[in-house]
């Protein structure tokens, strides 16, 4: 991670850390780095439903236009929609304005290259070097060489038509409950599943600029679980604010997380000859039960650091086509170049149709180890990892576990948090281990 770019672009509190002035510079310098070898380059921009999206979009557009780029605004659209359209529309770059699952006061800016993939570390470093320069020495075109802006609000429908053709049958006869987090999928997901002839019930589909992710979406699936039980739905699908995550709910109201969704997809893809190199790429946060279920089905796993960008890098390196995170980022590289909540949802429902099995049965083939994750707000993430007392309590707990479970302590890539996670044979033991470490982290580097 750099000074400005975290694991998922540039993020911060809108109008304080992520200011219009910074957004202008990011547009100008980012646009230059990604389009400098192209005459009259095209850059597309999408955003989620946050109140700050318009402000940041205006500044970004101005920065891009100042380099001579032609800018196409997509309006409210999901992050994977921007990734797909960047390549489909032959744009030199795509930009998404979103802070994903974060609260409304945050916002972020992430770029996609002409191939639809997120930027490399080298590209981000080049942009950061320009941001840190005291003097802006980039060319300043004038007159007819300046860029122009246009709107392409049909982009969302073009993207939906693309992902819709990845399933084999319609979804008639199924009742699907949707939670769109008052975010980027609020209009898109209900249209998509209704178009596939499913009966739908919805929540989180009334964005007002301030309610994105507020007690709804993939970080609050328990709310959708109540709707599933109330309506007698066959499945619930919860997306996050920018639509790159999926958490599901089975017909009994049980939450089905990213690990379980990956396992279901991996098993089906292996059975149908689609799983490349018989391998799934996941992160160190995936549940031990996920790996045991893969082993039982003779499927290989490959672990990376936390962050969908690292999963993607490993997938590209090894030629794999399925990967993801427990948090619900599922990457289906045969179809798209980033995590995609709606595409993952289509595949999950399609597997239910093809196997004629309810989601509870599909998910039940994986037994999860009890797990607890606690986020501790800290004054300094780097100091926390170097603190001797914190390192000592982690060592003591790992010795007590004696291989029967695991501890993972790591910094958040996007927020001032230390994440403390444990897995153990029982929830009671798991909770005790986590809280012992959390107490030390709070005492040593905890923020008020």
UniProtKB/Swiss-Prot annotation:
* Entry GO terms, CC: cytosol
Q: Which UniProt keywords apply?
A: Isomerase, Magnesium, Metal-binding, Phosphoprotein
Question: Which InterPro entries does the UniProt entry name for this protein?
Answer: A-D-PHexomutase_a/b/a-I, A-D-PHexomutase_a/b/a-I/II/III, A-D-PHexomutase_a/b/a-II, A-D-PHexomutase_a/b/a-III, A-D-PHexomutase_C, A-D-PHexomutase_C_sf, A-D-PHexomutase_CS, Alpha-D-phosphohexomutase_SF
This entry's Gene Ontology molecular function terms read:
magnesium ion binding; phosphoglucosamine mutase activity; phosphomannomutase activity
Q: Which PROSITE patterns match?
A: PGM_PMM
- The residues responsible for catalysis, as annotated, are 100 (phosphoserine intermediate)
EC annotation? 5.4.2.10
Please tell me whether the keyword RNA-binding is annotated for this protein. no
Q: Which residues carry this modification: Phosphoserine?
A: 100
Q: Which domain of life is it from?
A: Bacteria
- UniProt cofactor(s): Mg(2+)
For this chain, the Swiss-Prot or TrEMBL PTM comment says:
Activated by phosphorylation.
- Write out the GO biological process terms: carbohydrate metabolic process; peptidoglycan biosynthetic process; UDP-N-acetylglucosamine biosynthetic process
Q: Indicate the enzyme's highest-level EC class.
A: isomerase
What is any Pfam family matched here?
PGM_PMM_II
* UniProt: Mg(2+) binding residues: 100, 240, 242, 244
Catalyzed reactions per annotation: alpha-D-glucosamine 1-phosphate = D-glucosamine 6-phosphate
- HAMAP family linked: GlmM_B
Please give the NCBIfam families that the UniProt record associates with this protein. glmM (TIGR01455), PRK10887.1 (NF008139)
Write out the function statement from the record: Catalyzes the conversion of glucosamine-6-phosphate to glucosamine-1-phosphate.
> What is the name attached to this protein's record?
Phosphoglucosamine mutase
Protein source organism: Bacillus thuringiensis (strain Al Hakam)
């Amino acid at each position: 991670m750099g000074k400005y770019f975290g694991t998922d672009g540039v993020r911060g509190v809108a109008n304080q850390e992520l200011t219009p002035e910074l957004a202008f510079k990011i547009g100008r310098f980012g646009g230059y780095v990604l389009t400098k070898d192209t005459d009259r380059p095209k850059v597309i921009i999408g955003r989620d439903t946050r109140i700050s999206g318009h402000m940041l979009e205006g500044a970004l557009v101005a920065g891009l236009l100042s380099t001579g780029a032609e800018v196409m605004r997509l309006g409210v659209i999901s992050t994977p929609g921007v990734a797909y359209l960047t390549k489909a529309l032959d744009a030199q770059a795509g930009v998404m304005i979103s802070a994903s699952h974060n609260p409304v006061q945050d916002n972020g800016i992430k770029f996609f290259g002409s191939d639809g993939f997120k930027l490399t570390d080298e590209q981000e470093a080049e942009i950061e070097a320009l941001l840190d320069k005291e003097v802006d020495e980039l060319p300043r075109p004038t007159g007819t060489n300046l860029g122009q802006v246009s709107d392409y609000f049909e982009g969302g429908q073009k993207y939906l038509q693309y992902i819709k053709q990845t399933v084999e049958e319609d979804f008639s006869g199924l009742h699907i409950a949707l939670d769109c987090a008052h975010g980027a999928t609020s209009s898109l997901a209900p249209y998509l599943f209704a178009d596939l002839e499913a009966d739908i019930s919805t929540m989180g589909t009334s964005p007002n600029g301030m309610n994105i992710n507020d007690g709804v979406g993939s970080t609050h699936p328990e709310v959708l679980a109540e709707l599933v039980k109330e309506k007698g739905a066959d499945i619930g699908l919860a997306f996050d604010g920018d639509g790159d995550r999926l958490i599901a709910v089975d017909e009994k109201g049980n939450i089905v997380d990213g690990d379980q969704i990956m396992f279901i997809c991996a098993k089906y893809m292996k059975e149908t000859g689609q799983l490349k190199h018989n391998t799934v790429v996941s992160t160190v946060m995936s549940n031990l039960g996920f790996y045991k279920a893969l082993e039982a089905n003779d499927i290989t796993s490959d672990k990376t650091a936390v962050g969908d960008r690292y999963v993607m890098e490993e997938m590209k390196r090894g030629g794999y086509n399925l990967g993801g995170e427990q948090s619900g980022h599922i990457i289906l590289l045969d179809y798209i170049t980033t995590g995609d909540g709606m595409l993952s949802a289509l595949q999950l429902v399609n597997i239910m149709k093809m196997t004629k099995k309810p989601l509870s049965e599909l998910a039940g083939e994986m037994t999860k180890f009890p797990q607890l994750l606690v986020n501790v707000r800290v004054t300094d993430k780097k100091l926390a990892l170097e603190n001797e007392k914190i390192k000592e309590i982690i060592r003591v707990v790992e010795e007590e576990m004696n291989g029967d479970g695991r501890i993972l302590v790591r910094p958040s890539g996007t927020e001032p948090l230390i994440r403390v996670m444990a897995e153990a044979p029982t929830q009671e033991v798991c909770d005790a281990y986590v809280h012992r470490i959390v107490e030390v982290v709070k005492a040593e580097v905890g923020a008020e």
